[in-house]
Amino acid sequence: MKPRTFNRRIVAISSLYRWASEPSRCSVTGVPRNPMPPRSLLHAPKTTRGLSEEQYAALLACISGRRESDPKAQRDYVLIKGSYLLGCRVSEIAAIRWGDIESLDDGGQVHLLGKGGKARTVRISGDTLALFERLGRGENCSFVFPSPRTGGHHTRQAIGDVCRKWGRAAGFHVHPHQLRHSHATHAVQRGVDVFTLQAPLVTRQARLLGMTWPQILW
């Protein structure tokens, strides 16, 4: 159980005992005092905050400006912008194969393999499809972001290194999960309702959302 989940449950239980042990109720509830010990909460790390839209734009501009001098910049640009546009987990973007990216009449769709091996499909705009295809489409079974050392896909650690590298170059801290937070935050700020937002972020089935949201974020 994660610390935040544990803390929420402890607070809920403590609140119930505190309510039941109030002088006006304790004779009825039979709870003379709150039995929960003080300072029983676990330390929880600070919640991840997304990038501002200005920071996100500056990050992409920083990568774009170095495409000629850094041979990996084009791949990194697609990796970072693609992660943001899909709103996916780092493990999902790492494992994408070319066969998972499909072209449709009105854009495309990407099949992702999420937590617990649960598959989901996210609709994308034509611009997002073109972004990935800048890398040069490979065989269906080959990874979009292959590791040059192992022949498999990029690891979580390698993608984290890419984000940190360009974050330092842009002048602020960046890590992969921050892109997922930024995706959700910016979508809500631009008027996407929360229920629509849930589909590409957490749903297990394909959702046909149309092109409104991908075009908003693009």
Task: Give names to the regions the model predicted.
Residues 125-173:
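Active-site/catalytic core of tyrosine-dependent DNA strand-transfer enzymes
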Residues 101-103, 172-173, 192-218:
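Short, polar N-cap/turn motifs at the start of nucleic acid-interacting alpha helices
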Residues 24-27, 83-106, 195-196:
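Short, charged phosphate-coordinating catalytic segments
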Residues 57-90:
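Basic, Lys/Arg- and aromatic-enriched nucleic-acid-binding interface segment
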Residues 1-46, 62-68:
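N-terminal core-binding DNA-recognition domain of tyrosine recombinases/integrases
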Residues 42-60, 117-126, 139-142, 157:
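DNA breakage-rejoining catalytic core of tyrosine-based enzymes
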Residues 91, 95-131:
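Conserved tyrosine-mediated DNA breakage-rejoining catalytic core shared by Y-recombinases
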Residues 74-75, 172-191:
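Short basic/aromatic active-site micro-motif
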